[in-house]
UniProtKB/Swiss-Prot annotation:
Organism of this sequence: Sodalis glossinidius (strain morsitans)
Keyword Transferase: yes
Family affiliation: Belongs to the methyltransferase superfamily. RlmKL family.
SMART domains cross-referenced by the UniProt entry: THUMP (SM00981)
Gene Ontology molecular function terms on file: 23S rRNA (guanine(2445)-N(2))-methyltransferase activity; RNA binding; rRNA (guanine-N7-)-methyltransferase activity
Protein name: Ribosomal RNA large subunit methyltransferase K/L
Known catalytic reactions: guanosine(2445) in 23S rRNA + S-adenosyl-L-methionine = N(2)-methylguanosine(2445) in 23S rRNA + S-adenosyl-L-homocysteine + H(+); guanosine(2069) in 23S rRNA + S-adenosyl-L-methionine = N(2)-methylguanosine(2069) in 23S rRNA + S-adenosyl-L-homocysteine + H(+)
Location in the cell: Cytoplasm
Amino acid sequence: MNSLFATTAQGLEELLRSELETLGAASCKVALGGVHFQADSRLLYRALLWSRLASRIVLPLNVFSVGSDGDLYRGVQAVDWPSLFTVDKRFAVYFSGTNAAIRNSQYGALKVKDAIVDSFTRHGARRPDVDRQQPDIRIQAYLHRDQVMLSLDLSGSSLHQRGYRGAAGQAPLKENLAVAIVLRSGWKPGTPLLDPMCGSGTLLIEAAMIAADCAPGLTRPYWGFSAWSGHDEAQWQESLDEARARTQTGLAQTSSRFYGFDIDGRVLEKARHNARRAGVAALITFQTGEVAQLINPLPEGQRGTVVSNPPYGERLESEPALIALHNQLGRVMKSQFGGWRLSLFSASPALLGALMLRAERSFSAKNGPLDCEQKNYLLAETATAPGSVEGQIATDFANRLRKNVRSLQKWVEREKLDCYRLYDADLPEYNVAIDRYSSWVVIQEYVAPKSVDPERARQRLYDVINATLAVLAIPASRLVVKARERQKGKSQYEKLAQKGEFLLVEEYGAKLWVNLTDYLDTGLFIDHRIARRMLGEMSRGKDFLNLFAYTGSASVHAGIGGACSTTSVDMSRTYLEWAEKNLRSNGLVGRQHRLIQADCLAWLAMAQETFDVIFIDPPTFSNSKRMADTFDVQRDHLALMAQLKRLLRPGGTLMFSNNKRGFQLDEAGLAALGLRAQSITDRTRSPDFAHNRQIHLCWLISHADKDTFKSCH
């Protein structure tokens, strides 16, 4: 009897133990990452041919402590290597793990190799050759907590490599993990199995091989035991003959049928190719189709199991398409597959909440480095009638959004706007803002207070996303989701992503670039559009200054409005480059359109030029490392006005705006400075922000001895 160890993915050890016991293995003992068991040659070959869950089956040779490289060398030399393979066989060492003595796995492999070679030369034999590509003998050395387990790998390549998969989709499952998913799904051989997002078909192919009693190892071209001295060729051939006979009989007798769907026809061709190589193509029907159009292929009354590994994203809030996909899947399951079992395996378990289904059981497993979860559902026997997303969830939100769209439609068409707000936390339980940017939509989720259950908040976001897609009839690929909280200092300028994708939009004749994904804000504050149009009208023949210029949209309006010059000052090089791009897109090039990178407050204190029109929309608060002092708009606005007065020409106009809730303009202080102000907040608030009286505050300010407001009415 041989003492063996079968490895598997973490989380699958108990399944592997059960499988090995079914094959006849004795003394099975579960360990982290595998199962120890006893087997003679016949059972060893059966396990190699028939185990669907094992990654490797190895023969442990020695376990020893390593406190130095000398300990490693001596522990390897303690094995009688010439009794395991002959000198004419090529070998390779695969070493994993480090400790204080062996700090590099390559060094560890080298020491093991040297010890093996020296074992042969010590007995007068020549040095055996090393072959890393396809060795005859594979030696595994695993170092963990100063203990080395030295083994002979009898598998060769990993057992999950059945030999049938020539190509896979973007994120293939390993075959042994696919088997675990199928086994845990509750599917029984002889009953239908369907995968609505089957990719390269691994789940279906492995299930078909189970149903047809196909030995998974039959199609493997390479084994690690062939050059092992303990190999029994006659017993191996007998095991092969038995496996071939069982496979042939099983394929002829199975009544199981399998159905695979995927939106990508090219990936389905790979799936068909894989199924042919595995010998189960006759059992599986592959068809191109997307989840939303999925129809139950079985006659009414027949039941089966749906198993799938849906796509997932690392950042949930940036993947509205995935949220929509999961919600569509849940709706289709309820409407088309009443009475079926559903089992989904995901590296983003939170996405499964979008199914709107209650799981009856869940399992944990690793897919490579990813922590994953498999959830099983029993679908209600009575199928629900297909309906729109908003008809089933978030009805009040969907109705409000639809009402807003209708009420704004004529105004949007009249103003010829690409960008406008559709919803602004109108209903407290759906605390989001929804903005349209041409054919794109941005949902900004205001972060819920800590008193709100995170799961409930996430579910409401799912509802908002799906209802928005349905009401606006846009593809999920045109939806962007962001989380917004109260901004502090420079956080509004921090980068969220690295896509670098820009969209050109129009606003009252100005062409402006927006970026919907990379930053919290898009590069265009759409609540200020009327203020920007006013600046354009005010700036004809004038010199225009834009402080805290951001992406320069106000400078663009001034420029196309006929300003003699524009000067845009901002501390961010990124935003000034963006502003230059905006200016160029409107033909505003040349020395008369200046871009200055500077701390606006420091620049203002030093500036000697004067201007006819000044626009300033400062941050509510700033403590940037590149600014000498903090800035608070309520505390410091009078000092700011005193500096701006120096730069404002006689008869000139200053537009001052800010977003601080509860801000109070110190009109008495302004009068003491020789300035006067006129509130234009209501005039600059457009219909899409009519219900948000706190979106911004805005004033026109001029020298007290000049009447400059008449032309702005």
